[in-house]
């Protein structure tokens, strides 16, 4: 019999979250971002819940082909573009849209032999300083793209670095306007944070990612509490043992936690080999039998231990939610000095996953 740990993907929550995007950006089309195997959820598992989108955005050609095989006939955007000239053959065959962010990609499109023009998103580096043409070079890149017979529609694209923070988007939007002055075309700027908090950045296409999965772009669950988003992944397990610690006794590697009084602890079938962060400190929240409690001791490879003081009735077999419908993933991530994105993507292959 398998270990009791499992992850559940909530299809209805995905559809709900897409509808929240549309409420916030009612005049925009939506690229549903499903990179990194749909933020660890599984591309095939999220497809039924997100198929109401206008397009999908991702990184890998293999995942783009998989979407076509799942029956998706609409737009698919390669967010980092392509890396070799042979990739363009796949782009052409499967009618993909690609980002273009450097001269080497432009050169490959100029020399490609295509059955039809490729739609592109011409990316400006407006301040993130990762990918994209500088504002000073953007017009020349746009003119070059317009002159290329292998390029069809050109969408103007940039990416925000601080849409979830105090700096916001105004500075980058102003930078973009300077670099793209006089250039007409559809625009795609807004990530999840901009969808939620910066309506002036919505334009023609929005690119929500983390909000589709029910977590906060800021990493703070309170920031999205009133937005109607629902968690799309629940990681759950069970108690596989219960121990009673006497005052002064410790639990786990390194004896990191010492009981201040007699107490019951539960042993949970979940550890860092399942993708749960080893760095999780004492006090990281968990939910046992519907009651919120805390981790005590160090997370080990296959197990972690929890305080059963708030839930005295819990015994072997009691359900434990590590994050999900009852416990926001952002609350767990915050205690672990990380973000919900990372926890979702880190769920290990050995954890059974099902969609409902």
UniProtKB/Swiss-Prot annotation:
Its cofactor is pyridoxal 5'-phosphate. One of its GO terms (cellular component) is cytosol. The modification N6-(pyridoxal phosphate)lysine is found at residue 35. Keywords: Isomerase, Pyridoxal phosphate. Disulfide bonds: none annotated. The active site is at 35 (proton acceptor), 253 (proton acceptor). Catalyzes the interconversion of L-alanine and D-alanine. May also act on other amino acids. This is Alanine racemase. It comes from Burkholderia mallei (strain ATCC 23344).
């Amino acid at each position: 019999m398998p270990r009791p740990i499992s992850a559940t993907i909530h299809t209805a929550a995905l559809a709900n979250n897409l509808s929240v995007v549309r409420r916030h950006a009612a005049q925009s089309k939506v690229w549903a971002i499903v990179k990194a195997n749909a933020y660890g959820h599984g591309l095939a598992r999220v497809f039924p819940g997100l198929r109401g989108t206008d397009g999908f955005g991702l990184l890998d050609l293999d995942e783009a082909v998989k979407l076509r095989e799942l029956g998706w006939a609409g737009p698919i955007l390669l967010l980092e573009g392509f890396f070799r000239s042979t990739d363009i053959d796949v782009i052409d065959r499967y009618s993909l849209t690609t980002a273009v962010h450097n001269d080497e990609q432009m050169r490959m499109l100029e020399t490609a032999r295509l059955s039809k023009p490729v739609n592109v998103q011409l990316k400006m580096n407006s301040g993130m300083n990762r990918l994209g043409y500088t504002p000073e070079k953007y017009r020349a890149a746009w003119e070059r793209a317009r002159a290329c017979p292998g390029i069809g529609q050109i969408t103007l694209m940039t990416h925000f670095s601080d849409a979830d923070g105090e700096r916001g988007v105004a500075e980058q939007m102003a930078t973009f306007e300077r670099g793209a002055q006089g250039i007409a075309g559809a625009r795609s700027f807004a990530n999840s944070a901009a969808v939620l908090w910066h309506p002036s950045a919505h334009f023609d296409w929005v690119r929500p990612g983390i909000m589709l999965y029910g977590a906060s772009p800021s990493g703070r669950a309170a920031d999205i509490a009133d937005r109607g988003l629902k968690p799309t992944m629940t990681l759950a397990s069970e108690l596989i043992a219960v121990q009673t610690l006497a005052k002064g006794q410790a639990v786990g590697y390194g004896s990191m936690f010492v009981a201040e009084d007699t107490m019951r602890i539960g042993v949970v079938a979940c550890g860092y080999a399942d993708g749960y962060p080893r760095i999780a400190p004492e006090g990281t929240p968990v939910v046992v039998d519907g009651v919120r409690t805390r981790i005590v001791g160090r997370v080990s490879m296959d197990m972690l231990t929890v305080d059963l003081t708030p839930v005295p009735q819990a015994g072997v077999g009691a359900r434990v939610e590590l994050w999900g419908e009852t416990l926001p993933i952002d609350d767990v991530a915050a205690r672990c000095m990380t973000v919900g994105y990372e926890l979702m993507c880190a769920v290990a292959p050995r954890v059974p996953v099902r969609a409902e």
